[in-house]
Design a protein with these regions (language model features):
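N-terminal, positively charged, Ser/Thr/Ala/Gly-biased leader segments
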Residues: 1-56
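Acidic/His- and Gly-rich active-site-bordering loop/insert found
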Residues: 53, 62-63
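Short, functionally important structural connectors and interaction interfaces within domains
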Residues: 11-19, 23, 56, 73, ...
Length: 147
């Protein structure tokens, strides 16, 4: 990995991390750095770095193998949920259980299918997660992505 002064980024990170605590399977390898961006701008900064990157959310159903010379970016702190009437804008790191709870507290239904799914919105979108007769795509209007 090229020399990058990560301290100048002002983004929370940790060095020499074993990923077994970051996935539901408790399997892991050691990585030189794990970063926790709090917003889209911090995520963009990390994605623009000239090094190998691996992005994780909750680590649900993830098996980590060798990630030598790779930085890990955890989206766990990107969990903003904004209500605009009956429309939600949700960041990728928000857990499905948090989104469901917020929906129910605001009188919105349709997301109950996610009960018991341990993942995040980001992971649910990638896999079209579903259970109990419903999927994430059933209530989806649009997705914004970073290219």
């Amino acid at each position: 990995m090229d020399r990058i002064n990560f301290e100048t980024l002002n983004i929370e990170y940790y060095e020499n991390v074993n990923l077994s605590d970051y996935c539901t399977w408790k399997s892991g390898c050691n990585v030189p750095y794990i970063f926790y961006p709090k917003n889209i701008n911090e995520l963009k900064t990390l994605l623009n770095l000239k090094c190998k990157k691996y992005i994780i959310g909750n680590g649900s159903n993830t098996l980590f193998i060798s990630l030598k010379n790779t930085i890990v970016i955890s989206t766990k702190k990107m969990k903003s949920i904004i209500f605009e009437g009956e429309i939600l804008k949700v960041e990728c790191g928000a857990s499905l259980s948090l989104v469901m709870s917020k929906c129910l507290n605001n009188g919105l239904t349709g997301f109950e299918f996610s009960t018991g799914i341990p993942g995040t919105i980001g992971g649910a979108l990638i896999t079209n997660a579903g259970a109990n007769g419903g999927t994430i795509s059933d209530n989806l209007i649009s997705v914004s992505i970073l290219d």
